[in-house]
Regions:
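Membrane-topology and secretion signals of cell-surface/extracellular proteins
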Residues: 24, 66-68, 124-129
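Short beta-strand/turn micro-motifs at beta-sheet edges
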Residues: 60-65
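Mid-chain, well-packed structural core segment of small domains
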Residues: 73-90, 96-100
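Residue-level marker for the onset of beta-strands and adjacent loop->beta junctions
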Residues: 5, 36, 73, 99, ...
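Core segments of cupin and vicinal oxygen chelate
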Residues: 8-56
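Vicinal oxygen chelate
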Residues: 89-136
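N-terminal beta-strand motif that seeds the catalytic metal site of vicinal oxygen chelate
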Residues: 1-16, 72-77, 128-136
Length: 136
């Protein structure tokens, strides 16, 4: 069986979150999307389940973190180019997200990120394997 990853994130407003991520170019699997959750397709075998906070709470006995006040997780996605990193951040900002940090350029690796409408941090990274420094 092929492994899949489902990142589950608590959200406040389903339609607003779906509109935000649609503006970034993501699609949703209607088979696993309803008023309680939306299955966002990131790539083959990689998904984010955007879950209404009340529904998310049914999966844990711990309090649900307020992602606008504390960091619960950093979701990191690879990109095919520096331009793709910048374009996705641009789309996130245009859709109402924020960029909590400046881009970081390490020569062999370039990264930038955004916070979505619920405060979840999404890091985007492009790496140039040919430029990775050799191990000492």
């Amino acid at each position: 069986m092929t492994r899949q990853i489902f990142v589950n994130l608590a959200i406040e407003n389903m339609e607003r979150s779906k509109a935000f991520f649609s503006a970034l170019g993501f699609s949703f699997n209607p088979q696993f999307t309803n008023d309680k959750g939306a299955c966002m397709v990131i790539a083959d075998n990689i998904y984010a389940m955007l879950l209404a906070e009340s529904f998310f709470q049914t999966f844990t006995k711990k309090p649900v973190a307020d992602a606008t006040k504390s960091t619960e997780v950093l979701v990191c996605l690879s990109c095919d180019s520096r331009a793709e990193v910048d374009e996705m951040v641009r789309k996130a900002l245009a859709a109402g997200g924020t960029a909590p940090n400046a881009p970081q350029d390490h020569g062999f690796m370039y990264s930038h990120g955004f916070e979505d409408l619920d405060g979840h941090v999404w890091e985007l990274v492009w790496m140039d394997p040919a430029a990775v420094p050799p191990q000492a």
